[in-house]
Amino acid sequence: MDNDFILVLDLGGPQAVEMARKLRNQRYYTEIMSRGADEELFRRKAPRGILVVGGDGYSEPFPKAALALGVPVLALGGAARRMIETCGAVSEGILLKEQASQITFKPCPLFDQLSESDRYFARVDGFALPEGFVSIATTLEGFSPAYADLERRLYGLQFYAESNDPDGAVILSNFAEKICGCTPIWTAKDFLEEEVRYIRERVGNGSALMAVSGGVDSTTCALLMHRAIGERVTCVFVDTGLLRSGEAEQVRNTFEGELGLKLISVDAGDRMLNRLRGVIEPTEKRQVIYEEYMKILAEVGREHPEAEYFVEGTIYSDLLARGSSDAVYARRFDPGKRLEPIRMLFKDEVRILGELLGLPRALAARQSFPGPGLAVRCMGEVTESKLALLRRADAIFREEIQLAGQDKKLTRYFAILDDTRTVGRRLGVTTREYACVLRAVGEQGLASYTVGKLPYDMLERAAARIIREVPGINRVTYDISPCENTFVEWQ
């Protein structure tokens, strides 16, 4: 992409990912950088412009390295307040808080094609503007939620481009193209052609092993590698014993049958359960599973010394989550021999790429599944008997969701086995069995979720079937915890 891109500087919160994805959806390439980056890193990246977002609870000064580069800067939300203060503004206190107002845009490149709009403001502060800055918008109350130094191309808006916000999309597009000079050329098809060329140049006549789980990310990456180097990529599927009902067999059938890819399948269920014996804490579960998984991949690597490269289906959200850590690779391989072909793609872009590569539509729409599998949906110690209960309950819930036609409205839906035993009755006999929790969420915007509003009669059917068909579970609840206060997963 050379330097034809916007760098999104994340000061904290979910907005950075959402803004980056909005720009990508308009075909402008973006990369995200976390706060704390020094000026030298900014210069090496050499973006056309910088979008700074987040920081509503961020008390540190605005990153001066973003201002020192001399490229256009657009700061949104709390970042806009930090920027104007760093440039010498004096705060006059909070003028608006958590309310909607009409905003009138003044003529400037950022607001081209816009005149006025109704917006929600989490907070608007008043400022005595420093030299060079002018107000570029006013609210109905006469307050200024936006300002700019037009000569230095510094813009601050005390609001965000919201979900389903056409005016916000125009503002982002104006910044990228009319102010920064970026070209809207980012498409999955162009990425595919460019990445195939890169993989062929990098691997040459060599061969590779690729870790796959059967999910959208790793399957798409496997198809990409196969497009680039054909039979010289061999997929490695580790059946950890922590997958959903019938999933391991489905993965093997899909890769070897439907997709025609070379596959090594490793049955590691007993081995993984032995390592998990006595482990209760979620963090420790994840660590144990990760360590054992990587040991298995390293063993497979040693059994196939002809494979010079190790490939992972890492996507951009994985990259952002792990930060500067560079430890996610099989130990048999030199880090320089690791490939992560789709590491700069968001999940929705991976699905689009997958369809271009011939990924079956049903698999492209497959819901996300946590890396540690059912271990993080099984509260307390993970045992074979508890996993069996969870698989059966989960399969029933998923079946009822699909029968009710709710699957197209939801992003994720699954069962959780609580470690609590409750009093119940089965065939007239008092029981003390496990409680099961059902969870369903839909996507709201690009980086947030909302609780699934499922039909009550459907929930009743699912609960009745689980209690009737799964001895060992005598209570079913539905988790309606709001997603702004809780994670989608329980662990």
Language model feature labels by segment:
Residues 1-52, 56-62, 67-69, 85-308, ...:
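RNA-binding accessory domains that recognize and position tRNA/RNA substrates
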Residues 75, 79, 84:
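Gly/Ala-rich beta-loop-alpha elbow adjacent to hydrolase catalytic centers
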Residues 312-314:
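Extended catalytic-interface subdomain
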Residues 316-318, 444:
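Short loop/turn segments at secondary-structure transitions that flank enzyme active sites
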Residues 322-323:
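Short, solvent-exposed loop/turn and secondary-structure capping segments
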